[in-house]
Amino acid sequence: MAAKEVKFGDSARQRMLAGVNILADAVKATLGPKGRNVVLEKSFGAPTITKDGVSVAKEISLKDKFENMGAQMVKEVASKASDDAGDGTTTATVLAQAIVNEGLKSVAAGMNPMDLKRGIDKAIAEAVKHVQSIAVPCADSKSISQVGTISANSDSSIGNLIAEAMEKVGKEGVITVEEGTSLDNELDVVEGMQFDRGYLSPYFINNQDNMSVEHDNPFILLVDKKISNIRELLPVLEGVAKSGKPLVIVAEDVEGEALATLVVNNIRGIVKVAAVKAPGFGDRRKAMLQDIAVLTGGTVISEEVGLDLESATLEHLGTAKRVTMNKDNTTIVDGAGKAEEIKTRVQQIRVQIEETSSDYDREKLQERVAKLAGGVAVIKVGAATEVEMKEKKARVEDALHATRAAVEEGVVPGGGTALIRAVAAIADLKGDNEDQNAGIGIARRAMESPLRQIVANAGEEPSVVADSVKKGSGNFGYNAATGVYGDMIEMGILDPAKVTRTALQAAGSIAGLMITTEAMVADLPEDKPAAAPDMGGMGGMGGMM
């Protein structure tokens, strides 16, 4: 086992803090409507230019192991915010940095780290409650468009496009983002279905850029049982191989020898193939397989209807224009099913919705209707260069996550205003002792930091603006894009409540852990032995060359 270097107490925390600040300073430059860009070097090709906090955070890795641990912990804050709400990564990072900096000062002054953490946790919990209480529902196209615009760094064309997409496929529908071929953004609405199962083996991946499986015009085999014996699959595989088309298998499971053979065939290019587990469980799985069959014009191979795999032919297979899979989801676009049959199927499910008494069943049935009837909206991002395309695509994806979050939990006034109001709401909060009160104070001061950073990035004086916003009430805030004070919701500056809530929780959770750190352990750098010197020419051996 390699030797370790251990640091204790203040010296450990100071090194960790240095790493936190390096990463957070790079990320927070992107915050707000006047946030700056960050340029990321790529191992090949042009550098990437981004204003997306989590993209910047993911690129940073520091040479000093102790500083790097601090940076990685803040990176975790950004990733957590991104995973849970899809946005708010920069806000979460700014909050975490503020809490850690203030918290470590208090620890150095002799306060009890555990009480500080309890105070911070208490303040964050109350602030989250306040944010949820002031949220207003986000139902109409206008507010959806405003949320999308803010999240896409004040690009209204993106906000409008997302609002239009949501209008067309409904809030339950599926919206995906692709790279377009023209200079302008385009919106395509395609009949399709998405379900929450990903590829069964990473060896099926054929698009390395986004680690996904993409097949055009594939056959789709639907099986209502586990496939473990490759002999059962051979007749279908041979038929598909002759046709030259890809094959997508949707089954209860594909395992053992069958999965191994499919992987080998795929790698060798004999048959392009991908397998995915069928969505749902039990009777719901059977119903969803039947939905996919109706959508793709195929037949579910099930012993219940007297069909077995060995007797399956190409007639039993469904087809679709495109099937894409990542590790979590599969999307079937433009299935070859008859419109009349799809309509009948939707009607059947609607009858079940009316008859069911269980809320859970109703919700699942509504999801199935959305998948059959809602279709898939595809936003095609247009740009002049590849560098701009990648940056713009990342912004569209961010904006899409933000609008989904807004529809889910409502919106609050943006521009850091909601957090300033939360500070006022927890003004009377008290802990069990003085150190807990200090923790509450740390969290309250940290909640001002997103507004201050937005203002600083816009080139104004943070203290003056923060003071003016604090004196106001309700939705009164500062529009950094125009330099005007006013009602943030009327000005269309909205943040999804879920994004603000997640940023607070992620920052509080990880910053609390960092404040209570007492020791850090890292590998010692290995002293590599110096290379042996070259052997000089050895006299008398010339004849050997």
Curated annotation (Swiss-Prot):
Cellular location(s): Cytoplasm
**Residues the entry annotates as binding ATP:** 30-33, 51, 87-91, 415, 479-481, 495
Identify the keywords attached in UniProt to this record, alphabetized.
ATP-binding, Chaperone, Cytoplasm, Isomerase, Nucleotide-binding
Subunit and interaction comment:
Forms a cylinder of 14 subunits composed of two heptameric rings stacked back-to-back. Interacts with the co-chaperonin GroES.
Q: One biological-process term from Gene Ontology?
A: protein refolding
Which GO terms fall under molecular function for this chain's record?
A: ATP binding; ATP-dependent protein folding chaperone; isomerase activity; unfolded protein binding
Q: What is the first-listed, main subcellular location in coarse terms?
A: cytoplasm
Q: Which EC class does it fall in? A: isomerase
Which family, according to the similarity comment? Belongs to the chaperonin (HSP60) family.
User: Where is it found, in Gene Ontology cellular component terms?
Assistant: cytoplasm
Function in brief: Together with its co-chaperonin GroES, plays an essential role in assisting protein folding. The GroEL-GroES system forms a nano-cage that allows encapsulation of the non-native substrate proteins and provides a physical environment optimized to promote and accelerate protein folding.
Q: What is the lineage of its organism?
A: Bacteria, Pseudomonadati, Pseudomonadota, Gammaproteobacteria, Cellvibrionales
> Could you tell me what this protein is called?
Chaperonin GroEL
Against InterPro entries, the record matches this protein to: Chaperonin_Cpn60_CS, Cpn60/GroEL, Cpn60/GroEL/TCP-1, GroEL-like_apical_dom_sf, GROEL-like_equatorial_sf, TCP-1-like_intermed_sf
HAMAP family from the entry?
Answer: CH60
What gene name is listed for this protein?
Answer: groEL
> Tell me, what's a Pfam family for it?
Cpn60_TCP1
- EC numbers, comma separated: 5.6.1.7
Which reaction is the catalytic activity of this chain?
Answer: ATP + H2O + a folded polypeptide = ADP + phosphate + an unfolded polypeptide
